[in-house]
Every structure is written in C-alpha cells, then in structure tokens.
Curated annotation (Swiss-Prot):
Pfam families (alphabetical): Pribosyltran (PF00156)
Name of the protein described by the UniProt record: Adenine phosphoribosyltransferase
GO cellular component, one term: cytoplasm
Key words, A-Z: Cytoplasm, Glycosyltransferase, Purine salvage, Transferase
Cell compartment(s), UniProt: Cytoplasm
Name of the gene: apt
Organism encoding this protein: Streptococcus pneumoniae serotype 4 (strain ATCC BAA-334 / TIGR4)
Record-stated family: Belongs to the purine/pyrimidine phosphoribosyltransferase family.
Pathway(s) the chain acts in: Purine metabolism; AMP biosynthesis via salvage pathway; AMP from adenine: step 1/1
Reactions it catalyzes: AMP + diphosphate = 5-phospho-alpha-D-ribose 1-diphosphate + adenine
Length: 170
C-alpha cells in the first residue's frame, strides 16, 4: 500500500515557506490506518519491546493502537503541567528557543525495552528529549518508529545509533 496517497500536503502552513504533511486522511481511512499500525507493530515485535512511549499529541494517535495490538503499556510524553503525578523533564531546542517535555517518573521500569512511536520525525528535538527521559528512568531504547520523516531536516542525527523505522520519506 502506498501510504503517501493518504497524506495531504498543505503549502505555507502553519506559516509561509512551510510544507505541512497532514496525516488526517491516513487516519480517516481504516485500511490505511490499520496498515500503518500493523507495519509498526511488526517492527516492535521484531525489537521485542515492553513499552511504547509517544509524544503528544499525534504520538498518542499512532502509539496507542500499537501498544494495544501488542498487549503492552503506553506512556505519554507531555508538555509541562499536563501530567498529574511526579514527572521528570527534558529540554529540547526549537527553531526559536527552548521547550520542555515531561513524563511520569514511574512510567518506565529499569530494563524495560522501549519503542518511541510518533507521527513525524522533523528536526529530532522531541525524540532526543524523549530518549533522554527514557534512559534517565533506566529504560533500554529498542528503537523509534515514525509515519513520516522530513529528510532535509536531518532529525535522524538526533537519534544517534538507535535503530528506527520510517514508513514514508519526504
């Protein structure tokens, strides 16, 4: 299945000069959505993962069905102030400044094999901060999986030597 057939391209959104890749049409098509999830489930199975971690918000949309299919847990990564219990945090650089991500301090058990699942790999800041938190909690990075990678932004460099799977490249 050519998943790119289910990605909408919007020029100059959210601002001039940006080409936005919208996964909404993929999610709206049950066959395409299911196919994408199954591809990541197979990757996760091969990696023998114990836990899925997904950054808000679209990481939830992709990561939760993967965790469900595998019968394993899902840990959300959120912006500050969105999680109700004790959290750890990691900062990451954005185009104009620094932002912070958090996750529950008990989300990952030491030794758990963790797969990060998100919709998009762009600059890699989000995934780098997420890796930092997983490792701080003693998790073992099994890999990362993304629906889309924007190749020209070189986000893969922030993943380092960790394995990753991408379903579509732009």
């Amino acid at each position: 299945m050519n998943l790119k057939d289910y990605i909408a391209t919007i020029e100059n959104y959210p601002k001039e000069g940006i080409t936005f890749r919208d996964i909404s049409p993929l999610m709206a098509d049950g066959n395409a959505y299911s196919y994408a999830v199954r591809e990541i489930v197979q990757y996760a199975t091969d990696k023998k993962v114990d836990m899925i971690v997904g950054p808000e918000a679209r990481g939830f949309i992709v990561g939760c069905p993967v965790a469900f299919e595998l019968g394993i847990g899902f840990a959300p990564v959120r912006k500050p102030g969105k999680l109700p219990r004790e959290v750890i945090s990691a900062d990451y650089e954005k185009e104009y400044g620094v932002d912070t991500l958090t996750m529950h301090a008990d989300a990952i058990k030491p030794g758990q094999r963790v797969l990060i699942v998100d919709d998009l790999l762009a600059t890699g800041g989000t995934v780098k901060a997420t890796i930092e938190m997983i490792e701080k909690l003693g998790g073992v990075m099994a890999g990362c999986a993304f629906l889309v990678e924007l190749d020209e932004l070189n986000g893969r460099e922030k993943i380092g030597d960790y394995d990753y799977k991408v379903l579509m490249h732009y």
